[in-house]
């Protein structure tokens, strides 16, 4: 019966293919399928999924950016919804400013903050101005008036009363255990309905409020549910939180966000291990620390409120977000039609569980002095770095980075020592076959060294790996050169292409090499090379763990651990083979026995006709295994003696049973001195010797002149026969070598490979496949945003290698059927990937829209930004662009592959004012922006000049103020002052100020100051430009250019906003 796990082609092909398919198929299904929502509307008390979905459809009926009328309607709806929830739950609540004490002298369970007061002025970093006011890099600042809604749910252990007021109970402890924030933003972009960005976050936050205000669900520590406004343009709502009186008491947070349009909500990033412990036991965990480290290293530049909460306020928490498909992100397909209740439930269930864990932690996990002692940040204890990842979206692995560092260091130091120790032991036991090519025996030191096949196949693995890597990376580079965006719609085709070529090319080299020179050490050498390469990578991973606190290398830590154990098995299984000296002795004795048999039947033969000991050993090592012993028949001169196979005797020779003595061999054994006569002289005497033996004739053949070249009866007859018989019995007991491999390999356990593959394979396949797919999903549709087009291909390449590596030590045993099939698959997918159009109606290419007007001259341009190759065909479909010149240039705000293409937009003029205009003459926009800029010099200080600039814009909440010369000081009237938590005022001044009001048409008053300005030339340098934004496209005809785009662009294209405003109107001013 065939061993079902023997190291033979059939079992190896079957088990490896089965395990790969059994793991990869579920991983792909899980990656594509969102866990189903509960069938009941109320999965548990205090949560109503149907109600949440209805709220979502209500707030996503129209675009609702901060600078739109519908945004204000959404805000009113949310305030009413909060009140309805509290009333239905019977919770005692008050609005901020009312008395917190209710009946029976108890404090209200809930306080609602309708925040129309908080505002923030802060530095934003550098930019190159706006679209049509390009300058050298200048410092940006912002002034923003918030409209956040905050609901405080009092915890059981919270202080009573209005403890958050600065003058409340002076000297008393003020809610030292802190609060947990649940945050979501209710504004959308101007071109998206915001179902997942961030409508689902908003309705999830409402259900969190509903759950924790339901009877019996009061949290241990207080919870703040915040619905913030203004996140989309520059995280403004989170900046406004910094001015709220609850902010200093928030220790932990859960930020609910959307950077895709459905699917599962992933842990985008997290601050530490302790906050992840709160998330870890959700019903469907999803995420990996790799994503968090990618943010930390700057590989992902997308911003969420998490950045402000952590970097500015020092809070500890989690960013929970939707992240795919990116093609629908910020477009009109971010609606309820293109998402699901399953996605909503995935976020909602995780949010309630995590919030419950945060608020239920009454220990000191999130309390205490900060280790960095940073000024202005909340004292929320000491955190530790963590490592985390999910398995199949059902379980979650979480442990400390410090522990992984110790583990990595142990692997680096201990594992080489263990392998060196095993090698030393094998050498002492005379079983170190890996690094020994030949061996001599003490019994016959004069013999030629016996080859045992060590080092055979040693360099195959790195060569095969190099070839496979070359072909795979070449396919990636070819895609990037010929059709770089095919991954945008066909990422699985790219995955299959790379996996197929890597598998086939690696198999081709390894199988071919093993066919030409079979080696039983092939598998062991592959494991050894894997260990060496893994150890080198682990050095870099360990350094990053220690110096940069990067945990993303956990895959390589697990991989090297598995490789070490597999490598250890390859060394340990050598204990089952005979000693090298024993094997060599057997080969030499078999040789002697064959010499005896040949001469016993055939007389003396020419020494040149007899193969050397090395040739016999090599023949023995490469021939098929012997059959069962049979009774010897008299052989002819041209055939090997019966009872021998592959140069090794399997039955006693006839000489052992003959009543007559047989002639001894005269052929010299290699390595001995020989006095054998020449062929001619031997032929002359042969008949004479055979016919008449004398008293000088030796007992076993030959004659007196050949003494020195002969063995005695004792060394040739008895020892060879015993060894041959023993060898035959031993071969029957221990099995046969496989397909011309070294004969001693028949003693190796044929099942060891299976356990090696179980160590290397399943867990690494899971990690590589699901992590590779997750990272691919995160980036495969970012090329249209300006990201590097090669990035998704490099990710797929790296994880293709990691995916197939566990198979590589055994791949030479796989039958040709699988690799040949994959070669065909590679050819098909390569052809498709090279010629297919990269976009479709379900995977639309995103182009960025903007319209730009000079309100003084009426100059009007419509611009589309993206990859020029695809932007021009899009523009060609627009009626207003027909017959007009289209000019393109590199975009400064996007990547190097992105261009901005513009044409005259006079055919589609926007209607921006409060009242519709008819005809729109050249100067019809002149009254949209009113600027009054006056200068004054400080008394007694002629080196400084100040200016008061008043800006009023019709039907908008947003204008930018850009100066020719940066201002050395800046203040907004009625503003809260400069918030240095976001950075000190720049020494080289501020060149651009972004101004945001919470009301339409309200006037901004900006006080600016310059150094110098004593000459007319310097006065002129103090002039500038005002750029105002209009973003409300809900009423058809308001922005006809956008209406046209949504109607006429090809089905494979989508339109999204380029910047804060769909329309930007600019007007220059002089300070007088």
From Swiss-Prot:
The entry lists its GO molecular-function terms as:
metal ion binding; metalloexopeptidase activity
Which PANTHER family did the record assign? Answer: METALLOPEPTIDASE M28 FAMILY MEMBER, VACUOLAR MEMBRANE PROTEASE
Per its record, how is this protein called by name? Vacuolar membrane protease
Residues at which Zn(2+) 1 binds = 185, 197, 257
Native source species: Neurospora crassa (strain ATCC 24698 / 74-OR23-1A / CBS 708.71 / DSM 1257 / FGSC 987)
Query: What compartments host this protein?
Result: Vacuole membrane
Q: Which enzyme class?
A: hydrolase
Q: Where is the signal peptide?
A: none
Q: Which GO terms describe its biological process?
A: proteolysis
Q: Does the keyword Chloroplast apply?
A: no
Ranges that cross the membrane: 10-30, 405-425, 458-478, 493-513, 524-544, 555-575, 748-768, 790-810, 818-838
What segments bear the compositional bias annotation Basic and acidic residues? 606-617
Biased-composition ranges, Polar residues, are 643-661
């Amino acid at each position: 019966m065939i061993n079902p796990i023997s190291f033979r082609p059939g079992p190896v092909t079957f088990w490896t293919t089965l395990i790969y398919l059994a793991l990869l198929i579920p991983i792909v299904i899980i990656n594509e399928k969102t866990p189903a929502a509960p069938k009941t509307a109320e999965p548990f008390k205090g949560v109503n999924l149907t109600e949440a979905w209805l709220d979502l459809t209500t707030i996503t009926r129209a675009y609702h950016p901060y600078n739109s009328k519908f945004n204000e309607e959404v805000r009113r709806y949310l305030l009413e919804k909060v009140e309805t929830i509290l009333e239905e739950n019977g919770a005692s609540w008050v609005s901020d400013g009312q008395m917190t004490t209710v009946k029976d002298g108890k404090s209200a369970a809930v306080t609602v903050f309708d925040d129309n007061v908080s505002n923030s002025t802060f530095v934003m970093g550098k930019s190159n101005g706006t679209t049509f006011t390009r300058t050298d890099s200048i410092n940006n600042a912002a002034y923003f008036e918030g409209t956040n809604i905050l609901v405080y749910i009092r915890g059981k252990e919270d202080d009573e009363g209005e403890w958050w007021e600065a003058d409340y109970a002076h000297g008393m402890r003020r809610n030292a255990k802190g609060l947990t924030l649940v945050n979501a933003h209710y504004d959308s972009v101007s071109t998206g309905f915001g179902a997942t960005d961030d409508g689902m976050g908003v309705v999830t936050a409402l259900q969190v409020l509903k759950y924790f205000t339901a009877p019996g669900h009061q949290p241990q520590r207080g919870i703040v549910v915040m619905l913030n406004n203004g996140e989309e343009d520059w995280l403004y709502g989170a900046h406004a939180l910094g001015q709220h009186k609850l902010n200093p008491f928030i220790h932990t947070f859960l930020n609910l966000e959307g950077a895709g349009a459905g699917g599962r909500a992933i842990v985008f990033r997290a601050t530490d291990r302790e906050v992840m412990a709160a998330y870890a036991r959700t019903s469907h965990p999803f995420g990996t620390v790799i994503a968090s480290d990618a943010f930390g290293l700057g590989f992902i530049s997308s911003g969420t409120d998490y950045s402000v909460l952590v970097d500015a306020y020092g809070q500890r928490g989690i960013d929970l977000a939707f992240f795919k498909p990116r093609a629908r992100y910020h477009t009109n397909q971010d609606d309820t039609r293109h998402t699901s209740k399953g996605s909503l439930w995935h976020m909602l269930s995780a949010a309630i569980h995590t919030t419950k864990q945060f608020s239920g932690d009454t220990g000191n996990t999130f309390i205490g002095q900060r280790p960095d002692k940073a000024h202005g940040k909340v004292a929320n204890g000491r955190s530790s770095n963590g490592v985390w990842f999910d398995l199949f979206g059902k379980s979650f692995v979480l442990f400390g980075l410090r522990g992984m560092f110790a583990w990595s260091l142990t692997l680096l130091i201990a594992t080489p020592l263990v392998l060196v120790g095993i090698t030393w032991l094998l050498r002492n036991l005379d079983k170190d076959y890996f690094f020994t090519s030949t061996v001599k025996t003490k019994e016959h030191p004069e013999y030629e060294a016996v080859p045992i096949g060590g080092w055979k196949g040693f360099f195959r693995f790195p060569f095969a790996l190099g070839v496979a890597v070359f072909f795979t990376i070449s396919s990636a580079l070819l895609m990037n050169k010929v059709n770089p965006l095919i991954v945008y719609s066909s990422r699985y085709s790219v995955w299959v292409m790379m996996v197929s070529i890597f598998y086939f090319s690696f198999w081709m080299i390894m199988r071919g090499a093993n066919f030409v020179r079979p080696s039983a050490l092939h598998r062991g050498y592959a494991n050894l090379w894997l260990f060496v390469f893994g150890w080198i990578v682990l050095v870099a991973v360990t350094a990053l763990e220690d110096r940069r606190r990067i945990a993303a290398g956990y895959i390589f830590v697990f991989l090297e651990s598995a490789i070490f154990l597999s490598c250890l098995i390859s060394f340990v299984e050598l204990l089952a083979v005979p000693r090298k000296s024993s094997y060599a002795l057997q080969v030499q004795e078999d040789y002697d026995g064959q010499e005896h048999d040949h001469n016993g039947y055939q007389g003396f033969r020419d020494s040149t006709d007899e193969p050397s000991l090395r040739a016999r050993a090599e023949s023995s090592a490469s021939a098929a295994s012997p059959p069962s012993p049979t009774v010897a028949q008299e052989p002819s001169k041209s055939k090997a003696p019966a009872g021998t196979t592959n140069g090794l005797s399997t039955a006693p020779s006839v000489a052992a049973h003959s009543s007559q003595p047989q002639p001894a061999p005269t052929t010299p054994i290699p390595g001995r001195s020989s006095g054998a006569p020449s062929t001619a002289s031997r032929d002359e005497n042969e008949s004479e010797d055979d016919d008449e033996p004398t008293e000088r004739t030796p007992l076993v053949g030959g004659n007196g002149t050949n003494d020195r070249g002969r063995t005695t009866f004792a060394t040739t007859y008895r020892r060879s026969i015993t060894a041959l018989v023993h060898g035959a019995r031993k071969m029957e007991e221990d099995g046969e070598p496989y397909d011309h491999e070294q004969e001693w390999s028949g003693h190796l356990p044929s099942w060891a490979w299976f356990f090696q593959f179980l160590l290397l394979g399943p867990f690494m396949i899971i990690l590589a496949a699901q992590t590779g797919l997750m990272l691919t999903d995160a980036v495969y549709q970012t090329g249209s945003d300006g990201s590097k087009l090669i990035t998704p291909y490099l990710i797929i390449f790296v994880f293709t290698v990691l995916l197939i590596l566990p198979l590589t030590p055994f791949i030479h045993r796989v039958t040709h059927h699988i690799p040949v099939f994959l070669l065909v698959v590679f050819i098909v997918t390569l052809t498709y990937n090279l010629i297919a159009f990269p976009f479709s109606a379900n995977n639309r290419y995103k182009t960025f829209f903007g319209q730009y007007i000079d309100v003084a001259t009426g100059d009007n341009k419509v611009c589309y930004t993206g990859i020029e190759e695809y932007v021009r065909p899009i523009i060609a479909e627009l009626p207003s662009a027909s017959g007009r010149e289209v000019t393109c240039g590199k975009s400064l705000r996007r990547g190097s592959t992105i261009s901005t293409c513009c044409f005259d937009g006079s055919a589609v003029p926007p209607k921006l004012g409060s009242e519709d205009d008819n005809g729109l003459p050249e100067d019809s926009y002149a009254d949209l922006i009113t600027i009054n800029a006056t200068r004054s010099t400080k008394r007694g200080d002629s080196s400084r000049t100040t200016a008061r600039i008043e800006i009023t814009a019709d039907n908008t909440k947003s204008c930018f103020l850009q100066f020719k010369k940066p201002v050395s000081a800046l203040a907004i009237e009625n503003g809260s002052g400069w918030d240095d938590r976001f950075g000190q005022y720049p020494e080289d001044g501020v060149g651009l100020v972004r101004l945001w009001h919470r009301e339409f048409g309200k006037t901004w008053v900006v006080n600016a100051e310059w150094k110098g300005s004593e000459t007319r030339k310097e006065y002129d340098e103090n002039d500038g430009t005002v750029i105002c934004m209009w973003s409300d496209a809900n009423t058809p005809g308001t922005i006809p250019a956008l209406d046209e785009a949504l109607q006429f662009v090809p089905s494979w294209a989508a339109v999204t906003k380029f910047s804060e405003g769909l329309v930007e109107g600019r007007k220059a001013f002089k300070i007088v």
